[in-house]
Amino acid sequence: MPASTSTSTSTSSSAHSANEEPTQDAGLRARLVEAGVELVAREGVQALSLREIARQAGVSHGAPRRYFPTHLDLLSAIARRGFADLAARTAEVLDGNDGSPRARLTSLARTYLDFALSEPGMYELMFRHDLLESNRLGLRDTSLPLFQVLVDLVARIRPSTDPPPSVVAGALWGNLHGVAQLWGWGSLPLATGSDDIEPLLRATLDAHLGPEAR
C-alpha cells in the first residue's frame, strides 16, 4: 500500500507540472511580446533587438528563441498587437456609425492618421516589408481585413468606377500613408505652414473620391 501511494503521488505531481508548463510558456511568450510593445512605443523600431526585448522582459538573452524561432517571428507577434489595436480603434469609430459612406470613410481615415501619429514606432513596424512579405504568424491575415474595410467603403461611395474600388482604395491608402509619414517627420507642417492636418486629410479624400457633396 505505501508503494502504491508513493507512485500515485508522483504521477499526480508529474501531471500537475505538465499542466503548469504550457501556462508558464504562454505567460512568458506574452511577456516578451508586451515588452516589445512597450519598447517600440518608447524607443522606436530600432530598439527591438532580441537582447533588448529579453532584458526588458527580465529573462535570459536566449529565452526569446525558445518561443520565437526567429527575430521576424517575435517582431511579427509585436506587430500583430499593433494591427489588433488599429482594428479595435477602427471598429470603435465605425460600429454604430449611421453616417454616409463618405462620412464613415472620413472617420476611418482620421483614425488611421491618429494612430500613425500617436504610435509612430508601432506604425513603422506594422508596415515593414520584410514582416508582411514573410507572413510570419499569419500577419497578412490581420492586416488585409483592415484594407478590405476601406475597399468596401470606397465601393459604396463610387460603385461604378474604373479603376476598380480596390485600386482607388490602394491609392488612397498610399496617400494617407505618405501624409502620416511626412507629417510625423515635420515636413508637411513646415511646407504648409500649418499645424492642422485636417485640411490635408480632406484634400486627400477629395483627390481620390471627388469633392464631397454639400
Predicted region positions:
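Hydrophobic alpha-helical connector segments
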Residues: A77, A91-M122, P165, A169-L172
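N-terminal intrinsically disordered/low-complexity leader segments
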Residues: M1-G27, A213-R214
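Amphipathic alpha-helical linker/stalk segments
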Residues: R81-L105, L137-D152
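Amphipathic C-terminal alpha-helical segment
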Residues: L125, W173-A191, D206-R214
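Helix-turn-helix
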Residues: R31, A35, L39-D73, A77
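Solvent-exposed, amphipathic alpha-helical segments
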Residues: A35-R42, D85-G96, N175-L182
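Amphipathic alpha-helical packing segments from all-alpha helical-bundle domains
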Residues: S134-P159, S166-G170, D195-A207
